[in-house]
């Protein structure tokens, strides 16, 4: 199962959180969902060269929308004196007709963020770089940056071949079945003269284990419950 499903969706609620942090009743849910999709599409298109890793949305009861933009190049998003982020905020307010707050979050290690790695490979393929070279260079950079494992797959008319095929490489360990494993997944498309190429990237960053404090609380609760059961038995 871990080989087939989206690794992020499989781990949401276990070790990963939702990108949309809001609650809505049945009447408003569909409108908010469509609005979220429009916001993500608009921001991704406008700031594509800024290396957007992910976009998180939060909604408050007073018709306010907070957008967290995770980017590898925060300077390009903010602009000189904050002009860029202010312009983006005004455009989003005009589109949504709501009060919008834009928060820019810097991505410290873009080499181990799968979405940015996939987009970087796609950009290289559009510049006619050999697909094998582009994939292997991206894998080497990720492993040097501290990734525990990486898997890359490219599909389409590779090298201009008449028949489409899929080719992939992996390095290190990528345990897709382990739910506590922090697997980052990204997908991008490259528009070449021979047609579209699809790039998928899986990056293993290590295991996310429960904190020591939580373990102690759980152990204390278990001990209290067992003592209570003993008293009842007496």
From Swiss-Prot:
CDD domains: KH-II_30S_S3. One of its GO terms (biological process) is translation. One of its GO terms (molecular function) is rRNA binding. One of its GO terms (cellular component) is cytosolic small ribosomal subunit. Keywords: Ribonucleoprotein, Ribosomal protein, RNA-binding, rRNA-binding. PROSITE patterns: KH_TYPE_2, RIBOSOMAL_S3. The keyword Repressor does not apply. It holds the Pfam family KH_2. Residues 39-108 form the KH type-2 domain. Residues 212-234 are annotated as: Disordered. Gene3D superfamilies: 3.30.300.20, Ribosomal protein S3, C-terminal domain. The keyword RNA-binding applies. Part of the 30S ribosomal subunit. Forms a tight complex with proteins S10 and S14. Binds the lower part of the 30S subunit head. Binds mRNA in the 70S ribosome, positioning it for translation. Belongs to the universal ribosomal protein uS3 family. This is Small ribosomal subunit protein uS3.
